[in-house]
């Protein structure tokens, strides 16, 4: 679903002309954005998944002045914590999987009873108009909102004139 959200937000930013604003930011630690996704594909998930989320969190925190990144950081922390306490996999509520007729992939594990370890798991069903179905978490929702804020909202750069009247 992240790809869908990213592409929709990117398309909206192109259509609204806000894409030029996305390119103006001075990103810190940009390498920390790509590496975590590679780490999650490797074995040793109990170690590498938490490490990957720490790297993402650092990237978002170092760039917290960029609109949307704080929400993405919070969502990443929630998802990273949930995956970390569940052996490096995101738990998905089995009844929702059955409802949507979905199979698990290598990054997910099914659960049937809620506990403190599954409180922030994937249990929210999502149907997209083009036929794709997903189960998402509260952390995912925060990340998605952050992505839309980042791509779609017009940022306020420091080079803009101040709105505070000057005293004479």
From Swiss-Prot:
One of its GO terms (cellular component) is plasma membrane. It is a multi-pass membrane protein. InterPro entries: DUF5317. It is found in: Cell membrane. It comes from the Bacteria. Pfam families: DUF5317. Keywords: Cell membrane, Membrane, Transmembrane, Transmembrane helix. The chain crosses the membrane at residues 41-61, 133-153. This is Uncharacterized protein TM_1467.1. It comes from Thermotoga maritima (strain ATCC 43589 / DSM 3109 / JCM 10099 / NBRC 100826 / MSB8).
